[in-house]
Design a protein with these regions (language model features):
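Acidic-basic catalytic patches of nuclease active cores, encompassing PD-(D/E)XK
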Residues: 1-35
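Conserved catalytic cores of phosphodiester-cleaving nucleases, focusing on short active-site segments
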Residues: 25, 44-70, 74, 93
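Mg2+/Mn2+-dependent nuclease catalytic core
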Residues: 64-99, 103
Length: 137
């Protein structure tokens, strides 16, 4: 598989994971304010509001061939999508968050959350693990 094909598949998996996360948040009562907010120094996957708090959501998605492989990976504690949110990524996110807050003149409380999505595209199956406030106070 060529590098461009791999990147295209990775982008498709990521977009599918973000769509799943948006639907999950809506079902939980969040209002989606923005998606794929992009600056040259970074991107925020989802910006959502729940009551008086803005949630900046980083979505991490991993794809499996079958539900059996997904369940085996989960039960054995192998690679988890949320582990891919490094300190460097959080620093970049903070800079983009500052831009979003300035542009939208928001003085609401805010936090960074992670939505870890595992998908089996062929079987149209997905799971989501939502980790609120990954930085903490």
């Amino acid at each position: 598989m060529k590098q461009s094909q791999k990147q295209g598949k990775k982008n498709q998996v990521g977009a599918y994971g973000e769509e799943i996360a948006v639907n999950y948040l809506k079902k939980q009562g969040f209002v989606i304010l923005d998606t794929n907010y992009l600056k040259k120094w970074g991107e925020i996957d989802i910006v959502a509001r729940e009551t008086s708090t803005i949630h900046f959501v980083e979505v991490k998605t991993v794809s499996y061939e079958t539900q059996h492989l997904l369940k085996a990976a989960v039960s054995h504690g192998t690679w988890r999508p949320e582990e891919n949110v490094s300190n460097h990524k959080l620093i970049k996110l903070n800079r983009v968050i500052e831009s979003w807050l300035l542009e939208h003149q928001s003085d609401l409380d805010w936090q960074i959350d992670v939505a870890a999505v595992r998908i089996v595209p062929r079987e149209k199956y997905a799971t989501i693990k939502y980790l609120p406030n990954v930085i903490g106070d």
